[in-house]
Amino acid sequence: MPKFAVITGASSGIGAEFARQLSARGYELMLVARREDRLRKLSAGLTTTCEIFPADLAKKSECLRLVKELQGRRIDLFINNAGFGDCGMFLDTDLDKELEMISVNVRALHILTKQVARILCKQGHGALLNVGSCAGLMPAGPYMATYYATKAYVVSLTSALAQELREARSPVYVGCLCPGPVNTEFNAVANVEFALRGITPEYCVRCALDGMARRKTVIVPNPVVAAGMTLGRFLPRPVYIKIAAHQQRKKLYKR
């Protein structure tokens, strides 16, 4: 029986690459995103059965509609990937865009994490991967304040749930992918250019799948970022935040 995976934010970037690599491994897929045309174009190039589920996960009702669709179905893997960012001084960035970001990056992820984890635990197997960011591992992110805050939520929530399931001796895997810069259309949406060289989506997803196989709770695919995270543990918090601000300002100047 083929395995079944659900991928949100599947129309581009990391989500689309998860679809390609999982299809190559024989997974049947449900692809979720706002842009139906992109989902259909992606599915046409895949080798396994793909269901298209257009949804705007910024809306609570759409999240619950997806959950309802999944009730009673065997889920082997759920990739919680939908999300976006923004860059600029907090006093200048657009409030409506930030509230939509919080709706997608936090509320939608929270709803789907809770409801899908319940399904996985009830069926007694499966894996849930939340796509966070290395931003969520840092104390704060001046000039990307809201985005960093949303990703800190993702890392914290995922880590807590993973520990609860371990203590309950559940076979269900829960993990968080925390990439640094990845060469996708994230830049255009966030109105930013990376200060560090990005990795490819292909490499990012390979590392994610390998980390899941090893049941790592937090997966950091970029070795430069991973080294920075390790060194950052020895820095005073204010110093770390100043360094983060310096790196973020580079992005602003590149625009």
Please place each PLM-identified region on the residue numbering.
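The beta1-alpha1 cofactor-binding region of Rossmann-like NAD(H)/NADP(H)-dependent oxidoreductases
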Residues: 54-65, 95
